[in-house]
Amino acid sequence: MKKLSVIFLSVSMLSGIAFADKDKVVATYKGGEVKESQIMKEFKPQLNLQSGETIKNFDDFPPQDQEKLIKIYVNNLLLKEEVAKSNITSSKEFQEKLENAKNQLAQQELLANYIKSNITDKMFDDEYNKYVGNLKGKEQIKVAHILVKSQKEANNIKTKLSKGGNFTKLAEESSLDKASASNGGVIGYILLNQPGQLVPEFEKKAFALKVNEVSTPVKTDFGWHIIKVLEKKPVPIPTKEEAKVTIDNILAAEVLKKYISDLEAKADLKIMLPKAGSKAGS
């Protein structure tokens, strides 16, 4: 029994040593050193949330990202030391800002907890079914465009295209929409009448085009567009998992709107401003 205890103790010690060896020092600075575990503890939750992937080890990051994370971590430590040396946190102005920040953070936490506790599985399922129902039978199109300032410029580009000009090349050379210009003018897939996508004038013209057809110049608040439809296909129906973020956001907005409305009603809120269109004192 005594031998077993010794063996167990030895194995435990060796395991501890092996684990310690894995926690490599990745940087040193005056006053300390930085280990992999410190970087992971600081950044892992946030990075997993942003990337949507599970990052387990420091070595999972590319070398350039490892260096960035180390520098961010050390810079935070150095700035923390500088703050400690100063008397900035004792000033009245800082305390007021701190109190405001605490209040905002507390409100955000309150709302997040309220939303989480007031969205049921049934609500999610109902909203998902509604969302999917709206997508069934709909078509999505892949569009590209060239954006210019004037109708004259748009007409010139349309003429060049009619004479065999290359849409991709002209978009790269002429489009004011630099984000899509770098990709040959390609915006991506859009659905008709989806809030937050594109302006109505653009959508109306785009959905009237056939595949590979190029539009006449279209005016919007952004300028003049030449639109090309690259592809048309049915909208894919997402699974619950694929639609989770979208459905959660829809439900959160609905729950939050009702919560704020109820608070205003309980507070008997009355806005004393004159109605729109009426003159003060009339």
Curated annotation (Swiss-Prot):
It catalyses: [protein]-peptidylproline (omega=180) = [protein]-peptidylproline (omega=0). One of its GO terms (cellular component) is cell outer membrane. The keyword Ribosomal protein does not apply. The keyword Isomerase applies. Keywords: Cell outer membrane, Isomerase, Membrane, Rotamase, Signal. Its main location: membrane. Residues 138-231 form the PpiC domain. Its EC number is 5.2.1.8. It comes from the Bacteria. Pfam families: Rotamase_3 (PF13616). GO terms for molecular function: peptidyl-prolyl cis-trans isomerase activity. Residues 1-20 form the signal peptide. It is found in: Cell outer membrane. Belongs to the PpiC/parvulin rotamase family. This is Parvulin-like PPIase. It comes from Rickettsia felis (strain ATCC VR-1525 / URRWXCal2).
